[in-house]
Regions:
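Conserved alpha-helical substructure of the radical SAM core
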Residues: 1-59, 148-151
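Residues that scaffold the ATP/ADP-binding catalytic core of kinase and kinase-like folds
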Residues: 18, 47, 70-71, 75, ...
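Conserved, mostly hydrophobic/aromatic
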Residues: 28, 37, 62, 200, ...
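Short, conserved alpha-helical segments within structured domains
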Residues: 44, 107-111, 239
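Radical SAM enzyme [4Fe-4S]-AdoMet core and its adjacent flexible, acidic
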Residues: 53-55, 63-190, 195-203, 207-218
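Alpha-helix boundary/capping residues
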Residues: 59, 79, 119, 227-230, ...
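Flexible mid-to-C-terminal extensions adjoining Fe-S/redox cofactors in radical SAM and related proteins
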Residues: 205-259
Length: 259
């Protein structure tokens, strides 16, 4: 905050389960930083939604990976579709700016059109999606999750149609090319964005395993300098190059490499 950080996003895991969540929200938002919350939506009670509105958060992004209860609950095995939809409605009723995020899988790509329609009907101002990344828990179940090439073709065809349909009313934003294309762009034009992990380590970007600092030992100002220099580190350039031959290297993103 003292460094005039303009934008903060709280994600997880699930940030709203933290006992100090609203203390952090109200502290950050009350000192001029724009704040985004990425949540599963199940904790967006009317009371919580009103507090987010009162704190003037910039947006709340909810993961809604299906347009039906059957599909959503298959994806989010500990979630409940009706609770998430109600949470979205609570946030909308409170006047909280809403975004919807959708992760494509073998069993939910066919619902993308309905999901975009639902997002608009629920009051979202933006809808985000793209190709599912080979990382995290998805690595263990990739054979069950990854859409086929044919499914992706139809998926993005529908998204292009929906983007045109909702132009001027809701932004439908999607990354069609995948993580490798994004990493190539980042090497040329790094985003001014740090990823701070719960343990204080700071990553260059979520899709790469590189650490540029530790907030328990270094100041944010020093880490920012490290961040700017790190994108030219030969290790990172080589890692992105290796991804061209082995896209599954993204599975290594939790094997921390300090630069």
């Amino acid at each position: 905050i003292d460094l005039d950080v303009p934008y903060i996003s709280l994600s997880g895991g699930e940030p709203m389960v933290h006992p100090k969540f609203f203390d952090l929200v109200e502290y950050a938002a009350g000192r001029g930083s724009q704040l985004k919350i990425e949540t599963n939506g199940q904790f967006l009670t009317p009371e919580a939604s009103q507090r987010l509105k009162d704190a003037r958060v910039k947006s709340v992004q909810v993961s809604l990976d299906g347009a039906t209860r059957e599909t959503f609950n298959k994806m989010r095995v500990r979630g409940e579709f009706t609770e998430v939809v109600q949470g979205i409605r609570n946030a909308a009723d409170a006047g909280v700016p809403l975004e919807i995020n959708y992760s494509p899988t073998k069993f939910n790509t066919h619902e993308i059109g309905k999901a975009v329609d639902m997002a608009y009907e629920l009051g979202a101002h933006a809808f985000y999606t793209g190709r599912t990344m080979y990382t995290g828990t998805a690595v263990k179940t990739w054979h069950l999750l990854c859409p086929s090439a044919e499914q992706y073709v139809d998926y993005f065809r529908v998204l292009h149609e929906k983007s045109a349909e909702y132009e001027g009313r809701m932004r439908v934003h999607f990354h069609e090319q995948g993580i490798l294309s994004e990493m190539r762009e980042r090497l040329q034009s790094p985003a001014a964005l740090l990823i701070v992990l719960p343990n204080g380590l700071v990553k260059l970007i979520n899709a790469l395993p590189f650490i540029c600092g530790d907030l328990r030992k270094e100041s944010l100002q020093d880490i920012w300098t490290n961040f700017q220099n790190a994108w030219q580190d030969p290790q990172i350039v080589q890692f992105v190059h290796d991804m061209e031959n082995d896209p599954k290297k993204t599975a290594d993103l939790h094997k921390w490499i300090f630069v």
